Amino acid sequence: MAFRCFFDVDGVVLDFESSFIKVVGDYFKLEVPENYQPGNWFFSDLLTWEQVEEGWEYFLKSSDFENIPPLVDPERFNDIFGAYPVHFVTNIPPDCLERRQRNLEKVGYRFSSAHCAGLVQYDGHPGQTNAELIQDLLEDNEGFMFVDDHPDNCINVHENFPDAEVWLMSRAHNQDFNHPVIRRALHWDDIMKHPREV
């Protein structure tokens, strides 16, 4: 059976949180605790909603946006998943996608394509859910795996493809999520060492 791999970018293959917090912390002159981990998706234990919005706009324009370090060794990632088409999915404004692709290429990931999809919609950019994007890319009788750090994206894919291999990458902000079928990865090794029949 043919097989494809779909990976979220920020928080799964690139260390978005650390990069964003460093840039925004410097921008607002915040004293961010060492090894800070956000307690929720919107960093509300550190930032006001207005700071998140302003900081996000600043981050998008910064050079740091396209210099985010990897969360998994790209060489090892390529060795394990390089036999399959790899598609990266990111929920950023579509006009930033080219810069994100450059970032992924620069750190050494090999991939077939990168796309914008997810549950956050940006003004003037009608978006797709992850499941809709996957449906567009799959060919007949193909299996796939999907990895994301947001429970809602994992649920979206699982509900539309109940036989797919869906993983939630553990982060501080998703610790309360439990699901009988969606797998939780504590570390990349959980995904890399999982046996698959493809």
Positions of the model-derived regions?
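Active-site neighborhood of HAD-like aspartate-dependent phosphohydrolases
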Residues: 1-54
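Short, basic/glycine-rich phosphate-binding loops at helix/coil junctions
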Residues: 45-61, 111-115
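Short, acidic loop-to-helix structural element flanking the phosphoryl-transfer center
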Residues: 57-88, 92-101
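Substrate-recognition "cap/lid" segment bordering the active-site pocket of phosphatases
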Residues: 94-144, 154-158
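Short acidic-hydrophobic, aromatic-tinged amphipathic segments that line or gate anion-handling sites
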Residues: 114-115, 181-191
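Short, charged, surface-exposed secondary-structure boundary motifs
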Residues: 122-127, 175-182, 196
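Short amphipathic alpha-helix with an adjacent loop that forms part of the alpha/beta core around
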Residues: 131-139, 189-198
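Acidic, Mg2+-coordinating phosphoryl-transfer loop and its flanking beta/alpha structural elements
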Residues: 145-186
